[in-house]
């Protein structure tokens, strides 16, 4: 009986691995029609009885402001061009900080955030973290850095029911994502850690301060020219 259970488990793991690989490969070229986070928000609205209108309009790489691309990297993952999905020093620093009793501090890279938002549910269980690591590795293996950032920018949450750069630009500033200024891009990047609580168009003192820090980091990275580095390390 035990051997039968083990065989069934092995088959289940095989088909899960095969299915997830196929899914990641498909999304290498095909825009994801939605995300797990969007489904989660919709379910939460049904449970609470508060209707939510999900806004999302996929935009290709060239239709998104370069300033927003750099601002997101500056604010969320400055080692994005160099790592393979995991920022080990940042993870170690976050673990040490949390062990000292501070507020829970994360160290997720942009790739990890894409894996979580696209495929998984919210939470901090070891199962979810393990699946996040699996999908992160697959994404880094099969996608370019440009594709990872493109999917992130089209999937990130920027307000209640607001997903992706185009919906965010229209919701907060009434313009297309391609026309975002450096300041507007920094404000959008500044609210990513808490997009429901914070507003990019009506920034609190903290958000304004964080946006200023992000602008300085954008300059240190080299501005839009930094984007040329994204896949340089992967070229033969």
Curated annotation (Swiss-Prot):
It is a single-pass membrane protein. It is found in: Cell inner membrane. Pfam families: Transgly. GO terms for cellular component: peptidoglycan-based cell wall; plasma membrane. The chain crosses the membrane at residues 12-31. Keywords: Cell inner membrane, Cell membrane, Cell shape, Cell wall biogenesis/degradation, Glycosyltransferase, Membrane, Peptidoglycan synthesis, Transferase, Transmembrane, Transmembrane helix. It comes from the Bacteria. Pathway: Cell wall biogenesis; peptidoglycan biosynthesis. It catalyses: [GlcNAc-(1->4)-Mur2Ac(oyl-L-Ala-gamma-D-Glu-L-Lys-D-Ala-D-Ala)](n)-di-trans,octa-cis-undecaprenyl diphosphate + beta-D-GlcNAc-(1->4)-Mur2Ac(oyl-L-Ala-gamma-D-Glu-L-Lys-D-Ala-D-Ala)-di-trans,octa-cis-undecaprenyl diphosphate = [GlcNAc-(1->4)-Mur2Ac(oyl-L-Ala-gamma-D-Glu-L-Lys-D-Ala-D-Ala)](n+1)-di-trans,octa-cis-undecaprenyl diphosphate + di-trans,octa-cis-undecaprenyl diphosphate + H(+). Its EC number is 2.4.99.28. Its main location: membrane. GO terms for biological process: cell wall organization; peptidoglycan biosynthetic process; regulation of cell shape. GO terms for molecular function: pentosyltransferase activity; peptidoglycan glycosyltransferase activity. Peptidoglycan polymerase that catalyzes glycan chain elongation from lipid-linked precursors. Belongs to the glycosyltransferase 51 family. PANTHER family: BIOSYNTHETIC PEPTIDOGLYCAN TRANSGLYCOSYLASE, MONOFUNCTIONAL BIOSYNTHETIC PEPTIDOGLYCAN TRANSGLYCOSYLASE. This is Biosynthetic peptidoglycan transglycosylase. It comes from Pseudomonas putida (strain W619). The gene is mtgA.
């Amino acid at each position: 009986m035990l051997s039968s259970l083990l065989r069934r488990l092995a088959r289940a793991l095989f088909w899960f691995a095969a299915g997830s690989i196929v899914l990641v490969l498909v999304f290498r070229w095909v825009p994801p029609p939605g995300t797990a986070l969007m489904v989660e928000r919709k379910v939460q609205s049904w449970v609470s009885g508060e209707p939510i209108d999900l806004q999302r309009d996929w935009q290709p790489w060239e239709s998104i402001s370069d300033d927003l691309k750099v601002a997101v990297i500056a604010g969320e993952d400055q080692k994005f061009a160099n790592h393979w999905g995991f920022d080990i020093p940042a993870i170690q620093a976050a673990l040490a900080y949390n062990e000292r009793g501070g507020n829970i501090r994360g160290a997720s890279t942009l790739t990890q955030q894409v894996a979580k938002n696209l495929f998984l549910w919210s939470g901090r269980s070891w199962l979810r973290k393990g699946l996040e690591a699996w999908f992160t590795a697959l994404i880094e293996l099969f996608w370019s850095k440009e594709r990872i950032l493109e999917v992130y920018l089209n999937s990130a949450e920027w307000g209640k029911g607001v997903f992706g750069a185009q919906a965010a630009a229209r919701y907060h500033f009434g313009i297309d994502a391609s026309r975002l200024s450096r300041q507007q891009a920094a404000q959008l990047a500044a609210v990513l850690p808490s997009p429901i609580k914070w507003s990019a168009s009506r920034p609190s003192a903290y958000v304004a301060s964080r946006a200023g820090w992000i602008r300085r980091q954008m300059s240190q990275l080299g501005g839009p020219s930094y984007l040329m580095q994204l896949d340089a390390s992967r070229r033969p």
